[in-house]
């Protein structure tokens, strides 16, 4: 890893590889938030004690 100047410590990934992984992590978080919003909306609609 010391030989390759494009790899970043401590992961050993290049900047492009880390940006690609970051994109997937952010996309996954957005999907999680969307599911959570739908779940909270459905809980509000179908729970009489929340009205």
Curated annotation (Swiss-Prot):
Topology Cytoplasmic: residue spans: 1-23
- Please list the GO biological process terms of this entry: photosynthesis, light reaction
SS bond partners: none
Record's keyword annotation contains Endoplasmic reticulum: no
User: What cellular-component terms does GO give this entry?
Assistant: plasma membrane; plasma membrane light-harvesting complex
- Annotated TM spans: 24-46
Localization, UniProt: Cell inner membrane
Molecular function (GO) terms for this protein are: bacteriochlorophyll binding; electron transporter, transferring electrons within the cyclic electron transport pathway of photosynthesis activity; metal ion binding
What the entry lists under Pfam families is as follows:
LHC (PF00556)
InterPro entries linked: Antenna_a/b, Antenna_beta_CS, Antenna_beta_dom_sf, LHB-1/5, Light-harvesting_complex
Q: Write out the topological domains of type Periplasmic.
A: 47-51
- Function text: Antenna complexes are light-harvesting systems, which transfer the excitation energy to the reaction centers.
Q: Subunit arrangement?
A: The core complex is formed by different alpha and beta chains, binding bacteriochlorophyll molecules, and arranged most probably in tetrameric structures disposed around the reaction center. The non-pigmented gamma chains may constitute additional components.
The similarity comment for this entry is: Belongs to the antenna complex beta subunit family.
- Please give the name of this protein: Light-harvesting protein B-800-850 beta chain C
């Amino acid at each position: 890893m010391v030989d390759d100047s494009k790899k970043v410590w401590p992961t050993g990934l290049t900047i492009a590889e880390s940006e690609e992984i970051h994109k997937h992590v952010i996309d996954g978080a957005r999907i999680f938030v969307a599911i959570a919003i739908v779940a909270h909306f459905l809980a509000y609609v179908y729970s009489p004690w929340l009205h």
